Curated annotation (Swiss-Prot):
It is a multi-pass membrane protein. The lineage of its organism: Eukaryota, Viridiplantae, Streptophyta, Embryophyta, Tracheophyta. Keywords: Cell membrane, Glycoprotein, Membrane, Transmembrane, Transmembrane helix. This is CASP-like protein 4B3. The chain crosses the membrane at residues 43-63, 77-97, 115-135, 157-177. The keyword Membrane applies.
Length: 188
């Protein structure tokens, strides 16, 4: 039995008189809790990868007719949104590979825990802001065109923008977890 520095009660003592739950967690429970943010970030990055891929595919195939107003490549806003989706897809792919390697081997591809935390946080921030920038550039064009006519081209553009927004949400939530991990590294 060990004693807590803040109190004179032992760590293994029950939390309440009639309870059998220990006041502290076992090492295995702590390990599971420490790995929870890593697993959550991996899941969020997988969602970001999926939504970025879908946004890329939907926007790149948004060609209805032969050029002119029914082709996404004639609108620079859509090209920008497509470019940001490509960047998000590449980033999410790299981070998924890195996180999977980290979970499977226990070692990170980036040397140093603090450097890895900074890379995670900065990368998530840059990609999240890039995605929101791309979709906020494309959304007004789609809204304006949908007011004039509602067709498959506009619906596909709106779907691609929505998927890019979901990718943004996943990466921005991953940035919150990365920020939490960075703050823990700054304390240590």
């Amino acid at each position: 039995m060990s004693f807590s520095p803040a109190s004179s009660e032992p760590h293994d003592a029950p939390a309440a008189a009639g309870s059998s739950v220990p006041a502290s967690r076992s090492i295995a429970e702590r390990w599971k809790m420490e790995a929870a943010p890593i697993r959550a970030r991996l899941l969020l990055r997988a969602f970001a990868w999926l939504f970025s891929l879908l946004a890329l595919v939907v926007m790149a195939t948004d060609v209805h007719g032969r050029g002119g107003a029914q082709d996404f490549s004639t609108y620079p806003e859509y090209n920008y949104c497509l470019g940001m989706s490509i960047i998000a897809l590449l980033y999410a792919t790299a981070q998924l590979v890195r996180d999977a390697h980290r979970l499977s081997s226990g070692r990170d591809l980036v040397a140093g825990r603090k450097a890895a935390a900074v890379v995670d946080f900065a990368g998530d921030q840059v990609v999240a802001y890039s995605l929101i920038s791309g979709l906020s550039a494309a959304a007004p064009v789609t809204d304006y065109m949908r007011q004039a006519t509602d067709n498959l081209f506009n619906d596909s553009a709106a779907a691609a923008i929505s998927l890019a927004f979901f990718a943004f949400l996943a990466i921005s939530l991953s940035a919150l977890i990365s920020g939490y991990n960075l703050s823990l590294e700054a304390i240590v």
